[in-house]
Amino acid sequence: RNVMTDEIARKRVEIAIVTFNSEVEVISDFVPIERMPTPEIRATGNTDMAGGINKAIELVKQRTREYQCLGTSFHKPWIFMITDGVSNSPIDEMLQATRNIHFEHKQGCGLKFWVLGVADYDVDGMYQLTDEVVELQNEDFTAVFDWLSESMVSVSKTSIFEDAGLKYDDMPDGVIKKEEY
């Protein structure tokens, strides 16, 4: 079921959009899914991946603190990064971004981090960030977003204490769980 047609998911799922090419830009801070903008995003220029990752983590941590201050329970936050290339960020910045991902996953806000690689992305580099790497083989983004939507509906119905995530056995055709080389 689509996240927009599910009453519980529609109330619980919030989305933020961060782009990173030569510059990092917050297209949308966290908003309920029903108010999410649908921007046209194009791959241009360089790929400041470290800057994009760190900005996304910053937004997640800020939102987590807001929930904690309000005493509101919440599911583990997700970052789902879509990339078509190799990072142009300096090595030390990528190493720091990698450390930030691992810290927030293990000790911080419980962050779940996935990568969707398209075209000529850096598989090995993505596995330094996370074990959760999926590959889009036929550029069918609609199927991927439908799959994500179904996963969010499932997670929205679980207890906040359950470790729910993407269901790899339900992936659409043309999307595979990429194995590390």
Give the predicted meaning of each segment.
Residues 130-178:
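C-terminal helix of von Willebrand factor
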Residues 28-31, 69-71, 88-94:
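P-loop NTP-binding core
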Residues 28-35, 129:
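Short, flexible, mixed-charge acidic loops at enzyme active sites
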Residues 1-27, 36-75, 79, 112-125, 139-147:
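Von Willebrand factor
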Residues 17, 56, 72-90:
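DG-centered beta-turn motif at the end of beta-strands
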Residues 85-129, 135:
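VWA/integrin I-like adhesion module and closely mimicked acidic/polar interface patches used
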Residues 2-9, 61-72, 101-108:
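Alpha-helix termini
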